[in-house]
């Protein structure tokens, strides 16, 4: 005997939502909301941001409550069966639930119009009687429609309240509360308070006022605003730090280039005495070392030693400048393409300057033309850094405010061997890496090398 397939029973919430009267009312409200949103662009952007936040929170709530729902699935199925039976009886008593809103209104209008036409055509002389008859029909129709709608509202409200008071919904609410609290803690941990927020917190502590705990929706909106503001401030601080280090390195490289020019003019000038050239070069070397915070008066002051140390430090500084440029480029994603192209050009110029000193063993291998062009490139880099920072301060990138605030794994990180620890990549674009430098050339000499 062939087995009969049993159709899965719909949940009571799905059945209530699928009722023609409920679904048609929802469609009317939804269409009114969409039309209003399309009429006002600013309202549309705010509504879309709110919808996106609600979708994220709903996804977190569903994920948190899924194990609990699966555990209580038998009890939920039994409760759903009883609720569906009760809904069946209600639908039998109230056929209006299976009619859409426009049909209910049309039927009411049709009944009133038919009664009016029948009374008008048959008894034209009895105006008072016709008027009273029409009034009675209208009142009875309105009473029937109003009573049906009120009963439907009471049934739906009662069902919703019953579900909300159930243990399952209480557990779900608890899960959502825990998820929101955890999100707030993570934001405070990874995105510390800004100066303005610290001042507000200090004022709250001084007042000792009892503040009532805000509602769930207020906390949700505050979390979204807090996340956007702190993420923007942190990104701005990273770019400011990159700019500061870059300008310091550029200033030190200017001094190194000036020292190189001085060495070329004095050491290799046959018209001057060698001893005078060495003394003058040594004094300039000491002055530059003190300006960058490196001072050791015990080392040799021969021209060859100063020459090798100057070239080594110049290589180290140009490598630092190259690394800083790539760090800056990785932190300004979301800015207009012309700003990103300018930052990318900074890295190219830093690589060109580094190539000048990379393989140079003496000042003879660095011509005056290369030094002059390198100094010009340093000045252009300083101006570009100022332009990028000015744009960031005066123009906030929109996608830095609305997200997404999540790391994207780059190709090099996805190919990394398992088990290794590395910070998550911030952007998906691959950037050129600075040229590696050996310890003998790239690092600043220490006292032992003297």
Swiss-Prot record:
Acylated; primarily with C14, C16 and C18 fatty acids. GO terms for cellular component: cytosol; lipid droplet; membrane. Signal peptide: none annotated. The modification Phosphotyrosine is found at residue 232. Milk lipid globules. Structural component of lipid droplets, which is required for the formation and maintenance of lipid storage droplets. Belongs to the perilipin family. This is Perilipin-2. It comes from Bos taurus. The lineage of its organism: Eukaryota, Metazoa, Chordata, Craniata, Vertebrata.
């Amino acid at each position: 005997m062939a087995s009969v397939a049993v159709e899965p029973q719909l949940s009571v919430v799905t059945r209530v939502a699928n009722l023609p009267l409920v679904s048609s009312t929802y469609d009317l409200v939804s269409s009114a909301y969409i039309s209003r949103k399309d009429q006002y662009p600013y309202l549309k952007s705010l509504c879309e941001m709110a919808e996106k936040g609600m979708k994220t929170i709903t996804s977190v709530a569903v994920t948190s409550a899924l194990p609990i729902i699966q555990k209580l699935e038998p009890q939920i199925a039994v409760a759903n069966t009883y609720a569906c039976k009760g809904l069946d009886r209600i639908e039998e008593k109230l056929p209006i639930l299976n009619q859409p809103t426009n049909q209910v209104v049309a039927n009411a209008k049709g009944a009133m119009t038919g009664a009016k036409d029948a009374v008008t055509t048959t008894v034209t002389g009895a105006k008072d009687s016709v008027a009273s008859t029409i009034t009675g029909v209208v009142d009875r129709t309105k009473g029937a429609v109003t009573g049906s709608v009120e009963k439907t509202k009471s049934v739906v409200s009662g069902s919703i309240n019953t579900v909300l008071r159930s243990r399952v919904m209480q557990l779900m609410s608890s899960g959502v509360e825990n998820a929101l609290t955890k999100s707030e803690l993570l934001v405070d941990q990874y995105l510390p308070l800004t100066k303005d927020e610290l001042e507000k917190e200090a004022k709250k502590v001084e007042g000792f006022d009892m503040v009532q705990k805000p509602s769930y929706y207020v906390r949700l909106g505050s979390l979204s605003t807090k996340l956007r503001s702190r993420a923007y401030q942190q990104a701005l601080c990273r770019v400011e730090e990159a700019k500061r280090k870059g300008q310091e390195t550029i200033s030190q490289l200017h001094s190194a280039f000036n020292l190189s020019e001085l060495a070329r003019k004095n050491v290799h000038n046959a018209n001057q005495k060698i001893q005078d050239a060495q003394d003058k070069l040594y004094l300039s070397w000491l002055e530059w070392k003190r300006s960058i915070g490196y001072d050791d008066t015990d080392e040799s002051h021969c021209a060859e030693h100063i020459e090798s140390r100057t070239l080594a430090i110049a290589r180290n500084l140009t490598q630092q400048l190259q690394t800083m440029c790539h760090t800056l480029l990785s932190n300004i994603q979301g800015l207009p393409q012309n700003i990103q192209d300018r930052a990318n050009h900074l890295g190219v110029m830093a690589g060109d300057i580094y190539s000048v000193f990379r393989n140079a063993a003496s000042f003879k291998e660095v011509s005056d033309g290369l030094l002059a062009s390198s100094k010009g490139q340093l000045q252009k880099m300083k101006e570009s850094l100022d332009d990028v920072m000015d744009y960031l301060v005066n123009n906030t990138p929109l996608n830095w405010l609305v997200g997404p605030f999540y790391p994207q794994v780059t190709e090099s990180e996805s190919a990394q061997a398992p088990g290794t620890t590395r910070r998550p990549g911030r952007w998906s674009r691959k950037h050129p890496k600075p040229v590696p430098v050996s310890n003998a050339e790239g690092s600043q000499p220490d006292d032992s090398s003297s």
